[in-house]
Every structure is written in structure tokens, then in C-alpha cells.
């Protein structure tokens, strides 16, 4: 028997991966991103694609240059639910780029995406950032320092790097505490020198500037935050999320938090339930 199916003239549910887009070149270092977009975006003359809310995803990497493609298979589902997703890389601390290089890069990526919003079918007024581990540290800092001139480069300077929602998965919220907890991990001290420089007298101030728990202040115009963390995390202590939640909540900010029972760092943290919670949250806040 020959079965019959209808075609898909609107390309509904089809996702396009646009690889190795250079969004900036800093100190001779090309910075890349990958974009997941609806297939119709590829054929603007044949198809109209309504602007979609954007998710900027920052992969955890211990503040090195993260692997952009690691979460691509999981992120496809968000495009099928009406988003454009960009996974962005940043300069690596171990290559000599101290804090706040990674933060400046992620903010530059956001401004680039707003600048190219029409090309990639992005609604520049609906932008969320989502990060994991060190990428979640970057995401939190982006949310807490929107358009802060200290972290703004000259690239696409007319665009805003503010975001409309932040999703943080197992982020270092208290950087000194994170490094203390992982003191026995090989390379721990070297990474601190890479992030904060050779003058250790400056480390406390630099660590504070990189710690969302220290950066957050009352009376600011912050976006809503979704915090998620495994209570068996062996890399970033779970209590850091609790402390961050309590601080934001006490100061009257829009914040939700989830404890993932028995979950370590990455790996068994992830489940379809986690992705569904993130999707539902973003649908409420930016869609």
C-alpha cells in the first residue's frame, strides 16, 4: 500500500542551524556564535517569518571558550516552540583574557543580535539569556548590569545589552565561595590567576565584581530571574543559589527558584522536566 501524506508548505516545525557566525573580533580573537532559527528565515523572499523572541545561550566552560554546539540537540525544541536561539562563545580566561572580558563579549553578542534582528527574524524587544555554570554566572551578570558602561565595548554601541529575563542553571553566585569549595580541583589556583591577574591584592575586588551575590543591589531595574541548581552539586555549592534567591526575593525582585533533588553539576541535572519549566517560564516572561 502506498500511503499519502500532506506536504508542509509553510515549513512548520523545521529548524535551521546557522554555524560559525563571527559577531566580533577582539584582540585578534574571532568570536563566534551559532543560531537556531526557523527554516523560513533562510528564504525571506518566499516566506514571511514573524519576529521571534530570542534566547541567548551561554554554555558553561570554567570561563574558557565554551563548546557552542554542546546543547544544540536540546535547544532545538525551543525553536519549535517559537523562539530563535543563539549559542555564543567568549574569550577564554586561560588565554590571558581576565575578567571582565567574558562579560563584555556576551554583552557584545547581545548587541550584535539586536543589530541583526531583521536578518535573523528576532524581536529585539524580547530577549532572554540562559546560561549554565560559568555561562550562568555570565547570564546573571548580564541581567544585573544592563547597559553598564564599564562592560560595554564600542561594537554596536547604539544597541542595548539589557535582557528581559534570565535563566540560571547552577551558576557560581559567590565566586570566592565557589573557588573555596573546589580548592582541591586540579588547576583551581591557575584559573584564578587567569581570571583575576597576577596581583593577588586585587583579587577580592575582582571576585566581588564577578559575584552576582555581591553585585545585586536593592532598588534597581532588574529583569525577572529563574534560578535552578542541583542540591548534590560537587562543583558549585547549592547554597549559593539559595543565598541569591533570598537576596533577590528580600529586595522585592521577580525571582523563582528550583532545587533539583540529588543532581550533581551538569549531567543528571538535566531532564525534560527541567526544559519544560524553562520553556514555560520564558513563555510567561518574554513571549
Residue map of PLM features:
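Alpha/beta-hydrolase superfamily serine-hydrolase fold, recognizing
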Residues: 1-287
